[in-house]
Amino acid sequence: MFGSIAGGIASALAGGLMGKLFGGGQSADSTGIQGNVLASDNNVVGANDAGIKSAIQGSTVPNSQEAAPSAISGILADSGKHALSSLTNAGANKLMEAVGLSKSASDKGKDTKDYLAAAFPELNPWERAGAGASSPGMQDAGFQNQKELTKMQLDNQKEIAKMQNETQKEIAGLQSITSRENTKDTVYAQNEMLAYNQKESMSRVGAILENTSLTKQQQTSEIMRQMLTQAQTAGQYFTNDQIKELTRKVGADIDAVRANTARTHVETDRSKQEVQNSRYASSQVGKTAKDVSNAITDTAGSIVDYFRGADQKVADVYNNYFKDGKSKGIESNHRSK
């Protein structure tokens, strides 16, 4: 576009200068043949004859109405043309330089580089060239994507944690219900087993005491065997001192039963006292059987009497294990009234 403008301006300038410098016809007279005729020896031939004009002048025939240019005028015309051409070229070059059309691509690139270096000294050449112009945009887009991904991950983690929490609550609820049911069933079964064991123990101990064919030592051994077996089944174990104390107490109860039974057999009259003694002997057998059973199944506090001289801490642990409040336990002969 700038080239077209510059060319138009140059053409206008050249045309104007040519018109001013060389406008109008030439007034100088020409020498040689004048007019429209060509003289020969015998004939006069008209100069306007086309064939003659062509033969003499060539293909370009000068205008017969204008004077032929002289040599001086031709030199001046050539000089003027060269001067005008020089002026026109110089002006056009200046104009093109002003608008930046006369420089090569490398020169223009150098000028742009120098301009950017002066205008933006804080930037490096790569940044001034614009090569990194898209990098901030790409980084920003990547940062936004990372933010979105992080947010999605956090949301997913929250949802997963919520689901896990709800699941754990449901599991805990089921476990609690199951545990309560199991505990209820276990306690019921334990109570049933406790009642059964107590009944069985009383029956066996009573049978042993009523078996008069057994000696005191045999009765004591059988009762102690029953007691220790039940204790081991319940997970309770006694020390040697505790076993000795239990054996002594059982032996004392057996002596009382034997004495009352013998006294009942010796007395022959069926007096009131005999009936009372007989009833006492019978009740004493049942009482002893129950007391021995309670020592294994549900003794609350009186088992301490069996453990006199033994470790008090062990006795407390044993009493706590059989704490159900159902029985007074085995009453000691040495218990203060």
From Swiss-Prot:
UniProt-recorded name of the protein: Minor spike protein
- Keyword Mitochondrion found: no
Q: Where are the transmembrane segments?
A: none
General function of this protein? Minor spike component of the viral shell. Involved in the ejection of the phage DNA in the host and is injected with the DNA in the periplasmic space of the host. Involved in the determination of the phage host-range.
- One GO process term, biological-process aspect: symbiont entry into host cell
Q: Where in the cell is it found?
A: Virion
Q: What Pfam families does UniProt report for this protein, alphabetically? A: Microvir_H
Any one GO cellular component localisation term in the record: viral capsid
Q: Which UniProt keywords apply?
A: Capsid protein, Viral genome ejection through host cell envelope, Viral penetration into host cytoplasm, Virion, Virus entry into host cell
Gene3D superfamilies reported in the protein's UniProt record: 6.10.250.2700
Q: How does it assemble?
A: The virion is composed of 60 copies each of the F, G, and J proteins, and 12 copies of the H protein. There are 12 spikes which are each composed of 5 G and one H proteins.
Q: Which InterPro entries match?
A: Microvir_H
